[in-house]
UniProtKB/Swiss-Prot annotation:
Positions of the PPM-type phosphatase domain: 23-295
Gene: Ppm1b
SUPFAM superfamilies, per the entry: PP2C-like, Protein serine/threonine phosphatase 2C, C-terminal domain
Oligomeric and partner information: Monomer. Interacts with PAK6. Interacts with the phosphorylated form of IKBKB/IKKB.
Cofactor section: Mg(2+); Mn(2+)
Family affiliation: Belongs to the PP2C family.
Name of the protein in its database record: Protein phosphatase 1B
Highest classification ranks of the organism: Eukaryota, Metazoa, Chordata, Craniata, Vertebrata
Regions of compositional bias (Basic and acidic residues) in chain numbering: 1-14
Length: 390
């Protein structure tokens, strides 16, 4: 669960789509981890009468990808088909769910899928001990329902600022710790029984076998927290991401970075790729996944912002050339040396929230062109200290 590769796998999975007045893009990268355990869901138009609703989610698997992958395909179905989610009239016709129907139905869907997966032979006999966080949004014409189970996170940006974010479920949180202790467990080194770093998750059945306790009273609970927010014209975008992103970017930093990138590109896959690359260069050692959902009021491409960004790229290209020419007299410098020099300079118009790491790819491209035989180290590595102030 904590094994790393010698070099990160930087190939990305991308997708995008649009509908119901929304646009979305997503990106995922294995990074330094030995396995890719993340998964995602993106559904614009929920079947069976909720075509003007949409659902997006990110799942951060651990100890394997089995639970994350199954939930990415089947969680929405477990939510929308249970009796708590949708009431019916006397003729049996499904009615538009109320706010309370939706919130109760989401909770029921999580408990049902968790109980259903428990019967899978590999999960039941302990051959597979995987679990997964889940963070998502269900978007109706009037509301945004934020759903969280674990330490992945969702953030809403409105009027250029963080308007709302879900709260991580960590074992050291007082309410989580109380439940863990009441179930006979302990919190050591901020982990459940010194092992698991999240206090709520789907799967993880080794932590859900305390006799006399219900499913939401176990060491690890599958119960999500669900919040509803009325949609507003000022809504700009929602970000869903696993902790591989949040480990190196705060809510505010990520929203600032996304906002600035939307002003230079309307390609949401590109924006998501920039986030993932920037987090890799900031030192993230985990799998990384992000789903970006944009509303009609999301930032638009600005000619001024595009010009400013191009000027920044040209400045960085020129500085890398100067550094390498100057250092070349004593031998070609490595990329870490170039980055350390740049990190000490006052460079204007770096991407807010991303800093120099947000332009690492530009710097790498120039470095590789001038020194094609040099390994550029592939990721963050020894650059974390250089970029810590950025």
């Amino acid at each position: 669960m904590g094994a790393f590769l010698d070099k990160p796998k930087t190939e990305k999975h991308n997708a995008h789509g649009a509908g119901n007045g929304l646009r979305y893009g997503l990106s995922s990268m294995q990074g330094w981890r030995v396995e890719m355990e993340d998964a995602h869901t993106a559904v614009v138009g929920i079947p069976h009468g909720l075509e003007d609703w949409s659902f997006f989610a990110v799942y951060d698997g651990h100890a394997g990808s089995r639970v994350a992958n199954y939930c990415s395909t089947h969680l929405l179905e477990h939510i929308t088909t249970n009796e708590d989610f949708r009431a019916a009239d006397k003729s049996g016709f499904a009615l538009e769910p109320s706010v309370e129907n939706v919130k109760t139905g989401i909770r029921t869907g999580f408990l049902k899928i968790d109980e259903y997966m428990r019967n899978f032979s590999d999960l039941r006999n302990g051959m597979d001990r995987s679990g997964s966080t889940a963070v998502g949004v269900m978007i109706s014409p009037t509301h945004i329902y934020f759903i969280n189970c674990g330490d992945s996170r969702a953030v809403l940006c409105r009027n250029g600022q963080v308007c709302f974010s879900t709260q991580d479920h960590k074992p050291c949180n007082p309410m989580e710790k109380e439940r863990i202790q009441n179930a006979g467990g302990s919190v050591m080194i901020q982990r459940v029984n010194g092992s698991l770093a999240v206090s709520r998750a789907l799967g993880d059945y080794d932590y859900k076998c305390v006799d006399g306790k219900g499913p939401t009273e176990q060491l690890v609970s599958p119960e999500p927290e669900v919040y509803e927010i009325l949609r507003a014209e000022e809504d700009e975008f929602v970000v869903l991401a696993c902790d591989g992103i949040w480990d190196v970017m705060s809510n505010e930093e990520l929203c600032e970075f996304v906002n600035s990138r939307l002003e230079v590109s309307d390609d949401l896959e590109n924006v998501c790729n920039w986030v993932v690359d920037t987090c890799l260069h900031k030192g993230s050692r985990d799998n990384m996944s992000i789903v970006l959902v944009c509303f009609a009021n999301a930032p638009k491409v600005s000619d001024e912002a595009v010009k400013r960004d191009l000027e920044l790229d040209k400045h960085l290209e020129s500085r890398v050339e100067e550094i390498m020419q100057k250092s070349g007299e004593e031998g070609m410098p490595d990329l870490a040396h170039v980055m350390r020099i740049l990190s000490a300079e006052n460079i204007p118009n770096l991407p807010p929230g991303g800093g120099l790491a947000g332009k690492r790819n530009v710097i790498e491209a120039v470095y590789s062109r001038l020194n094609p035989n040099k390994d550029n180290d592939g990721g963050a590595g020894d650059l974390e200290d250089s970029l810590v102030a950025l």
